[in-house]
From Swiss-Prot:
Name of this chain's protein: Serine hydroxymethyltransferase
Organism: Caenorhabditis elegans
Enzyme Commission code: 2.1.2.1
InterPro entries (alphabetical): PyrdxlP-dep_Trfase, PyrdxlP-dep_Trfase_major, PyrdxlP-dep_Trfase_small, Ser_HO-MeTrfase, Ser_HO-MeTrfase-like, Ser_HO-MeTrfase_PLP_BS, SHMT-like_dom
Cofactors demanded by this protein: pyridoxal 5'-phosphate
Effect of residue 166 to D: In t1679; causes recessive maternal effect lethal (Mel) phenotype where homozygotes are viable but offspring display an embryonic lethal phenotype
């Protein structure tokens, strides 16, 4: 009895203490944040319905300045594009208000009737654009971007600490294909999966498929990745398929850069030979910033006795995306992707793709005319890699000077580069300017501007210091350099502003 009384008293004291603590916590939660400065919105306006120019002039000015930068400059980053006004309308629609964890017909929230309709429509269009049979292919349209899409695939088909093989980053691959250095595991894909990169032939710059096959038979990866971020030639998907089958691996194709050209039917498609295909939606596909994962359905293989082995990718990949890596999808992005996919089905989109390829070849020839070496000698797609090592200019220095002259590109490693931190070239792409209406004769002029910028970098290279930091400091203070760049920038702006940019007029 005494024990029970003590126990009750102890419990009473415990609850009393807990109650006291809760009251203290409650008081703390409601204590005003003394250091937060708040502003009062004007009485005659509505913060929820007014234009961003009124609600937040500071943000509006930044957006407006970015629009001006895009308009006055030459956008040559191969992974960028200008999406349409219709896609932007979808991104700014009421679809951004809804939470919808799960998949159509199986959501964790109510009120998803039209969200389901939009996601199913997006899936339908994604399959139509690439000519895929819904009985043989499925697609997940929820990945937030390309990197998590690739990670979801590895999670689904490779598993923790499983083995993957992708093209090495310095040779034209992507971070998400398993990149690491001797010093550290740079990408999470090399942290959670075992990665063995394959390489290009340092002489030709072309993928060494024989060496890839040899290493795949030794390494026995669960997935081989046929994908690039800076490789100007077509991939041999049939050869990839044979190697993957021989090694007992899935073939995953990452067509993020080239999916728009595949959609237009202008370059080889990975679908005939792949088990899984991923893509972003904002590069040559010209949509919003999102991603798609396509996966095989039906029969994977048949043994000598006629027994079929079926694909089981649908549930694995969908589960890896949600709930594995993501929560609620971005429904406004899915709406924007659906709009972009409808545009892919137009004749106008095919004409755009054809012009992208013509412009890339024109730019390649113009750069060669100016004496520059190109990795692989040219291009079959939307990009080219200019090797600046023969003229003694690092890619980062060329990128910096071109940026000052309103020409946006990116430094990039070239085959044979010793360090990814000091790349020897610059990558150039044609989709963005093609979307602005640039044609072959315009890209000849673009090539001339690039040449001028690189020559300015070369002219001042020796006196500008040994490090990139020294070089940038020099460009901020040296008056002859600043005069040369200002002259080029003025002519670039005069040329570029003749062309319109899709989207909203001012921001």
């Amino acid at each position: 009895m005494f024990a029970r009384i003590v126990s009750r008293r102890a419990a009473t004291g415990l609850f009393a203490g807990a109650s006291s603590q809760c009251k203290m916590a409650d008081r703390q939660v409601h204590t005003p944040l003394a250091k937060v400065q708040r502003h009062k919105y004007t009485n005659n306006e509505n913060i929820l319905v007014d234009h961003v120019e009124k609600v937040d002039p500071e943000v509006f000015d930044i957006m407006k300045n970015e629009k001006k930068r895009q308009r006055r400059g030459l956008e040559l980053i191969a992974s960028e594009n200008f999406t349409s006004k219709a896609v932007m309308d979808a991104l700014g629609s009421a679809m951004c208000n809804k939470y919808s964890e799960g998949y159509p017909g199986a959501r964790y929230y109510g009120g998803n009737e039209f969200i389901d309709q939009m996601e199913l429509l997006c899936q339908k269009r994604a399959l139509e654009v690439f000519g895929l049979d819904p009985a043989k292919w499925g697609v997940n349209v929820q990945p937030l971007s390309g990197s998590p899409a690739n990670f979801a695939v590895y999670t689904a088909i490779v598993g923790s600490n499983g083995r993957i093989m992708g093209l090495d980053l310095p040779d034209g691959g992507h971070l998400t294909h398993g990149f690491f250095t001797p010093a550290r595991k740079v990408s999470a894909t090399s942290e959670f999966f075992q990665s063995l990169p394959y390489k290009v032939d340092p002489t030709t710059g072309l993928i060494d498929y024989d060496k890839l096959e040899q290493n795949a038979m030794l390494f026995r990866p669960k997935a081989i990745i046929a994908g690039v971020s800076c490789y100007a030639r077509h991939l041999d998907y049939e050869r990839f398929r044979k190697i993957a089958t021989k090694a007992g691996a899935y073939l995953m194709s990452d067509m993020a850069h080239i999916s728009g050209l595949v959609a237009a039917g202008l370059i080889p498609s990975p679908f005939e030979y792949s088990d899984v295909v991923t893509t972003t939606t904002h590069k040559s596909l010209r949509g919003p910033r999102g991603a798609l994962i396509f996966y095989r359905k039906g029969v994977r293989s048949t043994n000598a006795k006629g027994v079929d082995t079926l694909y089981d990718l649908e549930e694995k990949i969908n589960s890896a995306v949600f709930p594995g890596l993501q929560g609620g999808p971005h429904n406004h992005t899915i709406a924007g992707i659906a709009v972009a996919l409808r545009q892919c089905l137009s004749e106008d989109f095919v004409q755009y793709g054809e012009q992208v390829l013509k412009n890339a070849k024109t730019l390649a020839e113009r750069m060669k005319k100016h004496g520059y070496a190109l990795a692989t000698g040219g291009t079959d797609n939307h990009l080219l890699l200019v090797d600046l090592r023969p003229i003694g200019v690092e890619g980062a220095r060329a990128e910096h000077v071109l940026d000052l002259a309103h020409i946006a590109c990116n430094k990039n490693t070239c085959p044979g580069d010793v360090s990814a931190l000091r790349p020897g070239g610059i990558r150039l792409g044609t989709p963005a300017l093609t979307s602005r209406g640039f044609q072959e004769q315009d890209f000849e002029k673009v090539g001339d501007f690039i040449h001028e910028g690189v020559q300015i970098a070369k002219k001042y290279n020796a006196e500008a210091g040994k490090t990139l930091k020294d070089f940038k400091s020099f460009t901020e203070t040296n008056e002859p350099f600043k005069k040369d760049v200002a002259d080029l920038a003025k002519r670039v702006e005069e040329f570029s502003t003749k062309f319109e940019i899709p989207g909203n007029e001012t921001f």
